[in-house]
Amino acid sequence: MKKRNVIRNAAVLMTTLVFVLTFITQPMFAHGATSQVITKIYTTNKVVALTFDDGSDGTNIPAILKILSDYNVKATFFLTGKAVSHHPAKIKSIIAAGHAIGNHSYSHPYFTKISTTQMKSELSKTEALVKNLTGKTTKPFFRPPYGAYNTLVLQTVGSVGYTKTIKWNIDTIDWDGRSAYRIYTKVLNNIVPGSIVLMHTGAGAKYTTAALPTIIKGLKAKGYRFVTIPTLLGINPTQITYVVKAGDTLYAIAQRYGVTVQQIATINHITNVNLIYVGQVLIIPR
């Protein structure tokens, strides 16, 4: 009997130890830090966001900026750290032209294949380079390289301030050198209100600059208005943010800032005003 008790106690101890070790070796995240994945917004307003991923060469940036300026269109550029290091003057010109920016990692790895430490390093290196060069932040917008993400990626990037993971609902696949006509038809045939369009700035996307004017004219003819990602999401970079604490309610937060519950709910895409959570980052409208 005594021997059985010893064996049983040893088994319980081992099970407990395994559980504890498993728990403490898992990455820890603030509750509610998970990044929100956005492929488009749901609206009846004819708005569209043109986005450009900038790899290490940025060959077409000057031509893209010229076209956007000619048609008075603002876009969003997702920057890699290598791009910032490789062509800083072009990055400055993006900011000077009034376009929005986001973080596209430093070296463009699959985030689903690297460690959480590496993910954070990829983001922080790019953020530091962009801030030092332009004084602007890439937060809270992250575009995952190759569009690849999983729960761990979303938890990790969210925990360091990238609360919006921006994907797309229209991929032009311009990087493979396809014709301007194919790029144009991909956009015009799939456009819906609230769309996010993916294009690239690199040399591989050699017909993007030829397609861009026709895309802009075609969408304008359909009644579309061009906006940046911050505008599409109702986020102004100068707006105040508030981190939800234990005991908070949307009503109390709204009273504190002199706005309505509905205003906070709308700008943060909250469908149930009773469901907010500790650690949630809320944008406060002005």
Region spans (language model):
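Structural recognition of the beta-strand scaffold that forms the well-ordered cores
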Residues: 48-51, 75-79, 100-105, 140-144, ...
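Active-site beta->alpha N-cap acidic-glycine motif
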Residues: 33-113, 118, 125, 129, ...
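Sec-dependent N-terminal signal peptides of Gram-positive bacterial secreted proteins and lipoproteins
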Residues: 1-30
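His/Asp/Glu-enriched short active-site or ligand-binding loop at hydrolase and phosphoryl-transfer sites
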Residues: 148, 153-190, 224-235
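Primarily a LysM-type cell-wall glycan-binding module
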Residues: 236-258, 262, 280, 286
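Soluble non-cytosolic domains of exported or imported proteins
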Residues: 55-59, 78, 85, 113-120, ...
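C-terminal domain-boundary segment and adjacent tail
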Residues: 35-44, 71, 85-86, 206-238
